[in-house]
């Protein structure tokens, strides 16, 4: 976002995160689990599990530290056997106050933003997408907690 001329004033911070895809045939869960990390059912005994936080290493490479952290988190929640299918790393936009930014640009209202969901995106994205859609289509007010107008644009 720092190179985006319209939204570069927003306090988005790049954060590296690592996650696993695991296979756990004995884990019978059909909802997202959240215990300081998420476990998202994908179907066919596959689950996406994550994520880690790293503000210094902004590469797309997986790390042994990330792997160890994820294994520790999984083992604190799951009592069944599992197999690691995939280990990935990526960069996600986060906001210092950990609240996503949604809304219309203050000077160019035809530009909309839906960003900064961070790791909680997996949990909040469905509700926030409906909320934003209602705002765009029905002119319903945005929740102040997520409205990008909470960030003052510097002149």
What is each stretch, according to the model?
Residues 83-155:
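C-terminal catalytic lobe of FAD-dependent flavoproteins
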